[in-house]
Amino acid sequence: MPKPEKVQKVEELYQKMLNANALIFTEFKGLSVADLTQLRGKIRPLNAEYRVVKNTLALLAIRKIYPDKDLEKFFVGPTAITYCYGDPFGVLKALVDYAKEHELLKFKGGIIEGEVYSADEVKELAKLPPKEVLLSQVVGAISAPLSSLVWSLKWPVNKLVWTLDAIAKEKEKISINQ
């Protein structure tokens, strides 16, 4: 029978995982406490937290959320989880930048909005701009052709109005001169 402390720890991990929209798994072997504190300080403003976990307990918790996914590969060796509660791409960028400075931080993979990604895929996702920028680019790409269409459709009508206005002014001049 499991100890109550372990059951409570699994429940805490489960709640954190459930509330996060992304989980990034890393290996931290060789990093000092000061290094990890510095990393936590970089991602905290991005609405994320970095926690070292016990593999067996984390695996029990994550299986409650993703029972059909093969996640055991992420829980081999020393493991830390970055819980992202906000924009995961900003956090990924911060983690990748930190890993460039501290080569001992290694990516194992991640789960972003329910999809499982390998370590290489996580690094590639870090190159994407934030969600708001992507959305504005999509809106811009959609609205530009629509604006052109509106102007194209309005142009003949505007031209007709200007022509009729010019004719009316010309007739007005003629009637004044008579």
From Swiss-Prot:
Any Pfam family: Ribosomal_L10
Keywords: Ribonucleoprotein, Ribosomal protein, RNA-binding, rRNA-binding
A GO term for molecular function: large ribosomal subunit rRNA binding
BP terms from Gene Ontology: translation
Cellular component terms (Gene Ontology): ribonucleoprotein complex; ribosome
SUPFAM superfamilies assigned: Ribosomal protein L10-like
HAMAP family, A to Z: Ribosomal_uL10
Function, as annotated: Forms part of the ribosomal stalk, playing a central role in the interaction of the ribosome with GTP-bound translation factors.
Family: Belongs to the universal ribosomal protein uL10 family.
Subunit architecture: Part of the ribosomal stalk of the 50S ribosomal subunit. The N-terminus interacts with L11 and the large rRNA to form the base of the stalk. The C-terminus forms an elongated spine to which L12 dimers bind in a sequential fashion forming a multimeric L10(L12)X complex.
Name of the protein described by the UniProt record: Large ribosomal subunit protein uL10
Source organism per UniProt: Dictyoglomus thermophilum (strain ATCC 35947 / DSM 3960 / H-6-12)
High-level lineage: Bacteria, Pseudomonadati, Dictyoglomota, Dictyoglomia, Dictyoglomales
